[in-house]
Structures are given as structure tokens and as C-alpha cells.
């Protein structure tokens, strides 16, 4: 087995040679562009969990992204170790040491994985799921809205590093942030079929009725097609394959495959969400020890021996009044997930970046799912979170309508100029871009001004 990465993955949409005496490799340049972008800085004013409120301890989307980057780098280090190849070597009937020697060559550098982790949330709008639903509803006849799609759009078009190619990042970096390689309006529920009635007052949109699909905006199809040019026709077709076909008009379709780099980033994001968001909620009292017992009952029945043996002591430490004990438990959990990451093969692909992924064994996924479900049930669905998101949802829908009614008067000058030059469909997207780029606090200030 001889693996080689196509040099096309280091290409940029626009020619962009390094400046004089700039000897940084391509992915370090990408990392710098993301790190110094306005969109990245804006994450410091976007709250990770709204139920936690104003507390010096709580995480923002910026600190969350930094922690995801640290976990991502640790996963890359884990995937260099011989033990991470055991399952793959058995499956392929190949020598572990030879697999290790070859596959280490295609792992992302720390610069690359940190770039993906820094960028993974920059397209998410203010007020979390409520903001996302609000913008998806307002864009329902114009391609929809979804946070991951907006991330791709920011990186490839909106961030003003170039006139029309966003940050002009390398192909491999862009491939790594694409979690759902399809077009959004294909994967979204078929609202137009009348299953979901389109006559509700926008201020009272039901969040479950306008959940967006997962994919890339059709407006950004040109950049998406350029991104996939190095792939064979078979790989492109397989890459966009859905997990299953739609059986109900209101069903969201999700794609089956991701790139190697994206699979690492997504695992890091899931671990941070499941463990660190739980830590925040415990510290400020959003969840109680009694509520946590519902998760403990499930964890004691898991197939993971380590979890079964340690769940009681971990629980005591998580809710201990001694801060160092809680941090010890959090560190142990993060280490547990990271050290179980292993290699996975996606048969059918010829491109190494798609053929190989990172994964967790089924018994560890079971544990991670219990943690994520607990955070969802007791933190994300907490009434305080839902009220803040609902308030934000109403604010964003109303702001969209106000800007749409008199854009040249009410939009900032640069945004108004872009709106004036755009087609009717593009005009809606420009208003959406402006609102999606706001922080929670800025959106509130603008709403109060209006």
C-alpha cells in the first residue's frame, strides 16, 4: 500500500503566493487567516449555552472552539499510535506497523486540524437553534439557512480577505469543514409540499416545524464544485450519498460520509459538547445530582468496562464542591474518549482523504451518546435556554422583515451597496448574511434601535 495526497488539495481558488520571506506552510497560513478573522472574534460574544446566563465561568462559542482545537490535536496524536490501527489491521488483514507507517502520512498537521476546529462554528447565527430556525423560515423560498452552510459561505465568499473568494483557503481545509457534502435544498424537509403549513405569523414559528436540512447553499454551488474537482466521478457520487432515502416529506436527509479531517474535527466537537457543556451546567446549577442519576442508570448498563467501573466515583467528583475533583473527572472523561479513537475505512473510495476516517468503537459511542442526550434533555431543552432562543428567534424574524422592507435606509452602507447590486433572490441572502453575522448582544442592540 502506497498512499499519496494529491497536490490539488493544497491549491486555492485564487492564485495566492506567499509574501516575501513568508515561509509558512499552506495550512499554517489558513490557520492565521481564520484566527485573525472578524468572524472568529465574533464567537467571543456568542453564548454556548443560554441557560447558564451571565457568569464569568461559562463557555462562549470562542472558548468552545479553542477547546475543540485542543481535543482535535490530541486525537491526531492518538491516531499516530500503533494501538489505533488494531481494528483496521484485522479488517484489512495487513501488518499494523506498515499501516501505521503509511496512514500517518495522510493525517492532518496540527495547523490544519486547528484551522478546522477554529472555523467549525463561525457560521452559526445569534441565539443558537432559535436563530437558525428564524433565518431558515425567512429564507424558506430562497434556499434556506443552516449554520454549517453559512460557515462554508463565510470561508469562501463573505470574509473580506479577497474580493470574492472569502479567506481563499486551501482545498483540504475547506473539505475538512464540509460536514454534509450535498446541497441544502435537497436535504431539507419538503416544506413546499404543504405538509408544513406556510401561513403562520413569523413571530410564532414553531422550532420543530422549520428545522433546516444539512448541506451547502445552492448560491455557493460554484465553490463547492471547485472544491470537489480533484475527486473521481465515483468518489464525488459516493461522497454525496445519503444515509437513507426520504420516506416522509418533512424528513431531514443527512449524508453518509465525511473526509478524514472532518471526522476528527467532528469527534472533537462531540466530546467538547458532551463533556465541557455538562461541566458548565453543573457548575452554575442548571443540572442537579438527582437529574444526573438518569444518565448514571444508563451508564451502569453500558458495554464499556471502564465506564461501569468508574461511573459512581466520576459522578461524585463531577458534583463535588472541591473544584479540583470536578476538573479531575472532566479530564478523565475527555481522556477516555480521545484514547479510544481509532482508524476506520470507507470502502469504495479511491481518494485517501475519503477512504479513511476516525471513529470510536460502538461501546464508546454508546457512552458519548448518553452524555450528549443528557446535555440535550437537561441543558439545551432547559426552559431558560428555550426562552432565550425563542426571544432571539422572534427578534431575528422581525429584524429580517424590517430590513427587507427598507434595506437602503436601514442596512449598513457596505451591505446596502451589495444589496442594491444584487438580484432579487440574492438580496434576501445578503440580508440573511448580515443578520447571521451578528453576535447575541449586537443583535439585541440593533433590534432595540429599530
Swiss-Prot record:
Family matches, as PROSITE patterns: HD
Q: Which domain of life is it from?
A: Bacteria
What keywords appear on the UniProt entry? Hydrolase
Instruction: Choose any GO biological process term that the UniProt entry carries and state it.
Output: dGTP catabolic process
Q: Which GO terms describe its molecular function?
A: dGTPase activity
Keyword Hydrolase set for record = yes
- Pfam families the record matches: HD, HD_assoc
Q: Which residues form the HD domain?
A: 61-274
Q: How is this protein named in the record?
A: Deoxyguanosinetriphosphate triphosphohydrolase-like protein
Q: Which organism is it from?
A: Histophilus somni (strain 2336)
